[in-house]
Design a protein with these regions (language model features):
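Nucleotide-sugar donor-binding catalytic core of glycosyltransferases
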Residues: 1-166
Length: 166
């Protein structure tokens, strides 16, 4: 089986760069690449393939209109899957209305949002997140900004002391 990926930030991630980047944000893609390879699925960014004829699935991690229109012209619409990797706060059209609209453009949609799941068209997937373990850093070494939100301003004025050293 062959899988092609249309990556987000296409220019910086083409030629399989998204699978080789060392930043922690790319850890899910590195893991996806190795897992696919282990079970015999060939996966590359779409620009690596010479021909799209033998590709089984094309995953869009971003809506790239250049590739979308090219693939529609090449009759690949039944191979295209959109992956709504980010929440709607990051990409606004990953909202419920946006996903409903995307259903008319893609054969399948993968989303992390359980409320957007629809039988036969929209499927759930678990987005892995990797965090760096933070250590104990003293406030003297760390530039620190604290925000306090209060609802009763009278209480704050009455009980607040100001640190003049800041």
């Amino acid at each position: 089986m062959k899988v092609a990926i249309v990556p987000f930030d296409y220019e910086n991630n083409k030629a399989d760069k998204m699978f080789k980047r060392k930043e922690i944000e790319y850890a899910p893609f590195r893991k996806m690449y190795t897992c696919f390879q282990e079970i015999g699925i060939e996966v590359h960014t779409i620009d690596v393939y010479d021909s799209l004829r033998n590709i089984d699935w094309i995953y869009f991690f971003a809506l790239n209109t250049k590739w979308y229109t090219s693939l529609i012209w090449k009759k690949c619409e039944n191979k295209m899957v959109y992956v709504a990797f980010e929440p709607e706060t990051v990409i606004p059209f990953h909202s419920d209305a946006g996903i409903r609209l995307m259903c008319s453009y893609f054969k399948y949609i993968l989303t992390w949002n359980i409320e957007q799941k629809k039988e036969g068209k929209v499927f759930l997937f678990q987005v892995p997140y990797f965090y760096r373990k933070g250590g104990n850093v003293s406030l003297e070494k760390e530039n620190c900004l604290l925000i306090f939100q209060v609802t009763n301003i009278q209480t704050v004025k009455k009980n607040c002391t100001v640190n003049a050293g800041r």
